[in-house]
Amino acid sequence: RVDRRQRQMCIRDRRINHAIFQNVEMLQANIDAVTTHIRKKLEEKGEKDIERKVLRFLPADTGKTYWHDGENYWRVMAFIPNARTYETVDPEYSYYAGVAFGNFQAMLADIPDELGETIPDFHNMEFRLKQLRDAVAADAAGRVKEVRYFLDEIERRADEMCKAERLHREGKLPKRVCHCDTKVNNMMFDENGNVLCVIDLDTVMPSFVFSDFGDFLRSGANTGLEDDKDLANVNFDMEIFKAFTKGYLESAKSFLLPIEIENLPYAAALFPYMQCVRFLADYINGDTYYKIQYPEHNLVRTKAQFKLLQSVEEHTPEMQKFIASCI
């Protein structure tokens, strides 16, 4: 599929998880469109280090950037020399993440290609609430009664948390090409600590800008663990928020609409809320989706995400004030 000379330039073959990404053709078409557009933007700017600033997937003998061996799907990506990733989430790297993901969205704001949803309804809050309500109606594991408090709290916030979908239907909020898996380790850095490019593009698809903003903060600004049993550990770290937001707005405010900017605090709350809904639905269903390490694991996760949500809500006025100072 890939000749010997090419293989010497490449990392090892990578299998595509087609259990999650069932439409591999769409998945790779999205990635090809995005990397081609970014490459064109970099060329127009006169970038001299393009091969380290955007991913490149090598074509198979079919001409496509993936192939099927009869059982699995594979692809090969060109090696990026002298590049590394970091797991650290601190204000410095959170700022870099904000710059990188904001710049990623900015470069793709005028992409002419129409991308598909590689995971349909991935960040659709109305869809996630329907899943929860269906789980409650079925009560397959007989657990609804014990989680009534969380169900009531979720429903109390449901109208507010679904406003992105409503605003989109009203024509006020656009969908844009987003990364949809914004973690600090999804960025490549050079030997001097400068950001090279955003990686792991499997989830690139149309979404609201809230996806990339809120998803990073859900994990990066959580002072505790996603499944922390001690809720005293779980709070929203405003230093991480400020660093990420500063970087994000520096690179993204040129294309963002006022309605997108003013709803960034909503985005910070949306993702712990959404994950709370998903963990709770799985607990009610009898733990059929997420891997668990003990019987109450999904309930513990639910409680931790709800505590994070409450902390985000408490910091909303401070977030609004900081965002205003960045514009």
Kindly label every feature range from the protein language model:
Residues 185-225:
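Catalytic activation segment of kinase domains across protein kinase-like and atypical kinase folds
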Residues 256-268:
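All-alpha amphipathic helical-bundle segments outside canonical DNA-binding/catalytic cores
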Residues 5, 16-130, 209, 225-229, ...:
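Conserved ATP-binding subdomain of kinase catalytic cores across diverse folds
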Residues 210-254, 270-289:
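Active-site activation/catalytic loop segments of kinase-like enzymes and analogous catalytic loops
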